[in-house]
């Protein structure tokens, strides 16, 4: 669902700026069975974000955010990436927005 905010995206001259890059993209076992077989795998994405608040420099930050989704180990990563990446990105966007807007 779309986010409801009065903020508007502008190409330049904005009060807030976000920059960032993906620093980690990893799939690893997240749960094993009693006989040591992987039951669930976890796709994790980590991003480093530089947030600049032109109105209050004290609110600016450089932070790392990580979000993940688990998937059944019987499925290949290539089968689930298209489904999981949008879910993970949505979590990252929410976390980053909340961190930048926490004192509004």
Question: Where do the model's predicted regions map?
Answer:
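Surface-exposed short loop/turn segments
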Residues: 4-5, 13-60, 68-79, 90
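Compositionally biased, intrinsically disordered linkers/stalks adjacent to structured regions
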Residues: 81-104
């Amino acid at each position: 669902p779309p986010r409801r905010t009065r903020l508007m995206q502008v190409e330049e001259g904005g009060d807030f700026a976000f920059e960032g890059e993906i620093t980690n993209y990893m799939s690893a076992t997240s749960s094993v069975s009693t006989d040591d077989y992987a039951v669930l795998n976890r796709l994790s994405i980590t991003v480093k974000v530089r947030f600049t608040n032109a109105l209050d420099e004290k609110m600016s930050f450089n932070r790392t955010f990580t979000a993940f989704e688990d998937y059944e180990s019987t499925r290949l990563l290539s089968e689930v990436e298209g489904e999981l990446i949008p879910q993970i990105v949505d979590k990252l966007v929410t976390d980053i927005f909340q961190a930048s807007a926490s004192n509004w």
